[in-house]
Amino acid sequence: MSLRRLSPSHLILGTLVLGVIIFNLYVLTSTHEDIKKVKGPTYHTSDNTKIQSHISNYDSEEYVDRLTAEIEDAKKEELISEIRKKLEIQEKPGVIQKLKTELRMKYIDDIKNHLKQEITEQYSNEIFKQYAFSFEIYSKKVDEYALQLENSLKPASCLAILQQAEKDTDSIPDLENYLTKANDKYFKRQEYWRYLLKDILLNNKPKCEPLTKEEKGEKLNPTYQWDARIISEQYLLGSKLTIPGEKFRALRSAHDQVVKQLKSLPDPPSQFISGHGIVVNGGGNMIGSALTAIANMRERGSQLPVELILDTKQEYDKQICEELLPKKLNGKCVIVEEQVGKEVFDIINEKFSRKIMGLLVSSFDHIIAMDADNLAIKNVDNLLFTEPYLSTKMILWPDLWVKLTSPLYYKIARIEPGEIVDRFGIPNDASFAEYITKDKQSEVHYHDLDNLPSTISVETGQMVFSKREHLKSLLLALYYNINGKDFYIDLLYQGAYGEGDRETIVPALHVMNERYSLTNHKVHILGYDAPNGKYSETTLGQTDPRDGFEFYQDWRKFLTSRKLDTRLNPFQSGGYTSDLMKQFHDYKRQIYQDKQYEDEAAVHRMITYKLPSILFLHCNHPKIDPLKNSKEADAEFGVYSRRNMGLPDKVEKLLEGKDWELRFHTISQWVACEAISKSSLYWEKIAGKSQQQVCESVGKYIEFLKKDTFDNEATKLTILNQLGEKSQPKQPEINNNNNNNNNDDDNGKNKQGAAS
């Protein structure tokens, strides 16, 4: 490129660049220390000797020490703060826990006493509130008011019967009779129950002959509820139970009529039914067992009032019903015969029907009902104030067996089976998707169908229910029992073990469309090895529904976490379910944290998950009855010759270290030798054996049980010993003519140890 082609601007720019280069070379190579200031930064220049001197200073030990000291001073506070935080995180939880432990040990007695006072006050307030809610005092006043003003209140009944009177009568004089009957029905207990039992239940008996032996067919083979087995509609009809057309129509017509009348009933009068309490059936010479059950509940801490149900006036004992129960055990006697009238009582004479009548005529609304041979091992009172009772107002417990109810019953009751919704008939590892494709008549478990009750059978040794809420179902269940021998026992059981009321409750609840809780829980079987080598079942252990409610919530959460069907049966037999339960225990073996305060780190502990614990021990054969048991005390293989619930090494873990067999018999000794010691009438009329003989027999058996007991506290009574002075048992005179009045065998005996 020639210079002529460069523009003046290019020449000027080149000159400036050349000048800057020359200037920089001059400055950087200068041998004098100068400071050159130009527009922009300030440049410091020096010769090489001074630069080397500064470098030497930086390398010196003195400089390094000085610099280190400066850094330490600057960072000292920061380092101390960091160390303090680390130590606090590492050591504080342990220090706090140590202080907690020291304080707990130092003040534990004071804390316990303070808590005891608070709990006592709180519980007293709760009991007061419960009675306030039950309107017990109010109901008594209403009852008194109604009786006092009976004549004045007759017009109130007029409106209820005018329409009926208009249809049934043509003359005015009959109206007074109608008013009198209506008034009696609403204001006299006996007339009220007579109306329900006679006018509705007895008057609607099927108008046909009972089923013949041929029509009843054959008995089916019972199945344990933990075994997965298809019991199909085809199998159930295979019993060959048949009902000819005319007889079937009569059964259905009577059933329709009684259901219609029951559904139209108003709520029961509050002066007849109110409050919370416990009802124990002691009829049929079961007073010894019943008093043991009641005394045991008091020893467990129960404070609810108790009603002891007796069948007849002949079972009434003045000392028991007027002194022992009201003055020491907060209870009273209720005689069924007096409540319903002799006419109705004599007609309804089957024992399980009378058991239901006893529940009906008791005065409580919210009831914990127990057989005389059923003993609680915990306080039962708050069953009425917790789930699942609050949601359903009816708690039922499972028996050992599955239902074998005939499909013909559901046709009589007009209950139509729906689609497959449950899976009791198949193993837990089977596919439900495949199950629902099976033939419903021959390949599907019948009670897995919608609209039908669960396949789980019911054990009615204990029930918890609201009578006001479930009166209609209880009356229908009584109707089934009244007509059981002729029709319904064969329709509902078809060979299933057990008898009586247990399989009549749930069908009645379904017909009336009333809510209830019946959950599949493990039923524990206790017994002994008989001399012939066979295992003899004596006792059923029923679990606490308060635990079961939470257990099933946990179980379903576990199944959901594994993406499994939440209907799987946790108590089904088989290896798959056993492995699944082990996984469930691992799933629940989690860390629980103490409550944290401020910045306190959590202290952890490991908790092993526990399945629902036992609440009731239903000792159905032999019963804990000091009178009956003492009659065979000298027999070689009698009740008092062995442990009936099992050897200590087999039951200690299940019963959580408490020897309940020894505890129960200790209480039965208190009943026989102290509680009814003043009742010469009882010993003469009912016992058939002297009190001294009974006490000696029970005492010897207690000493026998103490030899291998694992429970040193078993014979110590706390609450019962505070109820009054102990009296020495006296041998009353025995009327030999009455010695055989109570020599019948156990009426509550069941096949294979199934409870009634």
From Swiss-Prot:
Listed Polar residues bias regions: 723-734
Enzyme type, top EC level: transferase
Spans within the Cytoplasmic topological domain: 1-10
Keywords (A to Z) from UniProt: Golgi apparatus, Membrane, Signal-anchor, Transferase, Transmembrane, Transmembrane helix
EC identifiers of the protein: 2.4.1.-
GO cellular component, one term: Golgi apparatus
Biological processes annotated in GO: mannan biosynthetic process; protein mannosylation
GO molecular function: alpha-1,2-mannosyltransferase activity
Residues that span the membrane, as ranges: 11-31
UniProt name for this protein: Alpha-1,2-mannosyltransferase MNN26
Organism of derivation: Candida albicans (strain SC5314 / ATCC MYA-2876)
